[in-house]
């Protein structure tokens, strides 16, 4: 493992899904799988992930721009710039853009989850969007359960 510097607009991998762009700044392969970090852009009105629980990792959001809605165990929250949300392992949640402008946030998974997003990207590259059942099957492969 070596020190890495990733500048604004740069990333190790770029994935898209549900109209969102995910630019990974840190990947599992770079630090033994301890965590992954992405800069995620959410379009207004974009599709939210189905409510789910990460059974194998915690997830955290730091909002850079815009307004993000986060539902945690049925409680709706709105988080603006410089706001932070920690979703502990096993906690039901979903999130999306709550504003009329694009939202940007940093998303951290510990341990890393970048392999899941690579799979999600592949599902969304097809001619038609994946079915909710296809997304749930992928989620289950990575220790994510419906909430």
Residue ranges and their predicted role:
Residues 1-36, 123, 127-147:
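A short, N-terminal "cap"/entry segment at the start of jelly-roll beta-barrel domains
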Residues 7, 13-15, 74-92:
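Short acidic-glycine-tyrosine-enriched beta hairpin
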Residues 8, 23-25, 38-54:
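Conserved short histidine dyad/triad with adjacent acidic residue
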Residues 21, 60, 67-69, 76, ...:
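Structural motif
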Residues 39-43, 53-71, 108:
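Short, conserved beta-strand element in jelly-roll/cupin
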Residues 51, 72-73, 95:
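Soluble, non-transmembrane catalytic domains of enzymes that act on hydrophobic metabolites at membranes
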Residues 54-55, 68, 84, 94, ...:
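Hydrophobic small-molecule pocket/channel-lining residues, especially in calycin-type beta-barrels
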Residues 89-114:
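Ligand-binding loop in jelly-roll beta-barrel domains
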């Amino acid at each position: 493992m070596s020190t890495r510097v990733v500048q604004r607009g740069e990333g190790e991998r770029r994935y898209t899904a549900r109209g969102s762009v995910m630019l990974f700044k840190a990947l599992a392969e770079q630090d033994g799988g301890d965590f992954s970090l992405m800069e995620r852009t959410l379009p207004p009105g974009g599709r939210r992930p189905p409510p789910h629980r990460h059974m194998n990792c915690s997830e955290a959001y730091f909002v850079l721009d815009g307004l993000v809605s986060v539902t945690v165990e049925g409680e709706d929250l709105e988080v603006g710039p410089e706001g932070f949300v920690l979703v502990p392992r096993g906690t039901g949640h979903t999130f999306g853009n709550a504003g009329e402008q694009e939202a940007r946030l940093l998303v951290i998974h510990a341990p890393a989850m970048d392999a899941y997003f690579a799979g999600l990207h592949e599902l969304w590259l097809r001619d038609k969007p994946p079915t909710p059942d296809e997304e749930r099957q992928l989620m289950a492969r990575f220790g994510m359960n419906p909430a």
